[in-house]
Amino acid sequence: MVVFIPIKEESQRVVGKNFREYKGKPLWKHCLDKFTDYQVFIDTDSEIILDEAEEYENVRAYERLDYLKGHETSVVDLIKNFVDIYQIEDVVCQVHTTSPLLEIKHIKEAEQRMKESKSDSIFSVDKIQDRLWRKEDYGITPINHNPLKLEQTQDLPIYYRENSYFYMFRPEVLDTDNRIGKSPLMFEVEWPYNMDIDTEEDLNKLISL
């Protein structure tokens, strides 16, 4: 299995979030430190990362192509370009540097599940078993419960939310322009491991842990 990490120099909601420090080290280096047992590829537009990634023997950082730069580019397009350039045939695990509490044991367990199954992909999720509502133009409507019949939450239907902690897949899955194939598995990840740094508030929560 190989690991793919897309890293932009600029971010939209948190300024320079990939370079923000946690315990004296930028988030992107925290991520690399967890994957010493794997070959890691970084797609980046950052000269800093292209230079400093050379400190890691198992890491290959390469410059993002001009037509793939910008906030509108899909991560799937980045992965397809990576797989094509390096002729990747192994399973790919894609992660983000903004999951600072990622545990390598979860990655190894997911990798093992894929090996033992006939699944073409596995992705991380949050389990949700609460009373959910949806806001519509005409008002609000329940999703998974009947407000006129109060049930205990443990009796409600279970929903799962992709949390982007990781996506693991065989390269041919990308033919559908997705990271999730036709026979996927889900992998539950609980708080705080599934924390994703997407706002300044998230960053403050991380620091306070």
Language model region names:
Residues 37, 88-89, 116-120:
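Short, high-confidence coil segments that cap the C-terminus of an alpha-helix
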Residues 47-93, 101-109:
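Short phosphate-binding loop-to-helix
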Residues 100-192:
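Conserved core of the sugar-phosphate nucleotidyltransferase
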Residues 187-188, 193-209:
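Hydrophobic helical membrane-anchoring modules
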Residues 1-2, 88:
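Catalytic phosphate/metal-binding cores of nucleic-acid and nucleotide-processing enzymes, i.e., regions
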Residues 8, 66, 126-127:
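Histidine-centered beta-alpha loop that forms part of the nucleotide-sugar donor binding/catalytic region
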Residues 44-49, 172-173:
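Short, polar loop motifs at secondary-structure junctions
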Residues 2-44:
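N-terminal glycine-rich phosphate-binding loop and ensuing alpha1 helix
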